[in-house]
Design a protein with these regions (language model features):
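Positively charged n-region of N-terminal signal peptides that target proteins for export
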Residues: 1-4
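Extracellular ligand-binding/catalytic regions of CAZymes and related secreted enzymes
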Residues: 23-34, 52-53, 63-67, 228-230, ...
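Active-site rim elements
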Residues: 44-47, 176, 180-185, 235-237, ...
């Protein structure tokens, strides 16, 4: 046993070192209404290609609005390559000074040193934007000190975990056939004057709708109308009534401070190609930062750099890509797979 101990310690040390061996991707803004704001984006899902969506959104907010945007990914601890869905996300300590968390994860069970900064951020009531699978962003064993963040947590004090208690809803199920049904996004008439909706029109998402029944106190801004095909012009699915697709709420933090939250059940990488949906996300960011007075219906939401989302059609994810391969304004998102 004495002989084994040094080896075990060496393995543990190596594993911890590997977990932290990927440098974060940072887009440094220069000027704009969000100048000086620190935004942290966490991307690690298995299906909807958050590793494409969040870097592009971060670029838009950095270049057009002046924010400093740090993008974190699920990382293969041995290679440093982006590994979507991997429960290893180095760099979450950036949340210590963050003004906003944008999260797009699915079924994560992070090591304590990576999960604790997220908990600390929520405990101080930091604003949160959650996209698509963030409603079931954590899947954590019952014996973990972070078990209450699990999307199926049963305890009444934090029922259904991070999704329900912070974002306003957990995973309920698909609403219509995913990959066969896209989603028209309609503004709720009673919410039309809300700042987040300024300039938003003709919004559409490639992804199918989710069942969603936001927690009491949520303000529903947009509903999802399932379509029978994968084009904005596809016919309406007459068997499906509108379902909540985007809402706002305030969550109560451990510090007692109320934290702003915006949630959308859409957000696949291809959804950002739609001007209406992209504006919705940009406006939601400014609102989350308390900058709603800066939201104008004609604010710049143009794409930054080559953006080629690949969710629709089931294209394979590019492999052997590191965060630094996405640096700067002009690198492709994502680059071609390395040969």
């Amino acid at each position: 046993m004495k002989r084994l101990l040094p080896s075990l310690l060496a393995i543990a040390s190596f594993t911890a070192m590997c977990r932290s061996n990927a440098a974060p991707l940072i887009y440094q803004g220069a000027d704009g209404p969000a100048k000086g704001k620190q935004l942290v984006f966490i991307a690690s899902d298995h299906e909807y290609k958050s590793e494409e969506a969040l870097p592009e959104l971060a670029r838009i907010l950095a270049k057009h609005y002046g924010a400093t945007c740090t993008v974190l990914f699920g990382i293969d601890p041995l290679t440093g390559y982006i590994a979507p869905g991997n429960s290893n996300i180095p760099g979450t300590d950036a949340l210590k000074t963050a003004d906003l968390l944008v999260i797009f994860t699915r079924f994560q069970n992070l090591p304590p040193e990576q999960m604790q900064p997220i908990v600390d951020y929520l405990d101080r009531g930091g604003p949160v934007i959650g996209l698509r699978t963030a409603t079931h962003g954590f899947k954590i064993p019952a014996d973990s000190p972070f078990a209450k963040f699990d999307f199926q947590y049963k305890g009444e004090e934090f029922k259904n975990g991070f999704g329900r208690q912070i974002l306003g809803e957990t995973w309920v199920g698909h609403y219509g056939p995913n990959h066969k049904s896209s989603t028209r996004l309609d503004i709720v008439p009673e919410a039309a004057a809300y700042p987040i909706l300024r300039g938003v029109k003709d919004a559409w998402a490639e992804v199918g709708a989710y069942n969603a029944y936001p927690i009491e106190g949520s303000g529903i801004l947009v509903t999802a109308q399932p379509l029978t095909g994968m084009e904005p012009t596809s016919p309406v699915d007459e068997t499906k009534k509108p379902m909540p697709a985007a809402w706002v709420r305030e969550y109560k933090s451990a510090s007692g401070k109320a934290g702003r939250a915006f949630t959308t059940t859409c957000g696949g990488s291809g959804d950002l190609m739609n001007d209406g949906f992209r504006r919705l996300l940009v406006n939601a960011t400014l609102w989350s930062l308390g900058l709603e007075n800066s939201i104008q219906p004609d604010n710049d939401i143009s794409l930054v750099g080559p953006f080629r989302p690949t969710w629709h059609g089931g294209a394979k994810r590019a492999r052997d890509i590191k965060p630094e391969d996405l640096a700067g304004w002009d690198s492709p998102i994502l680059p071609e797979e390395k040969k």
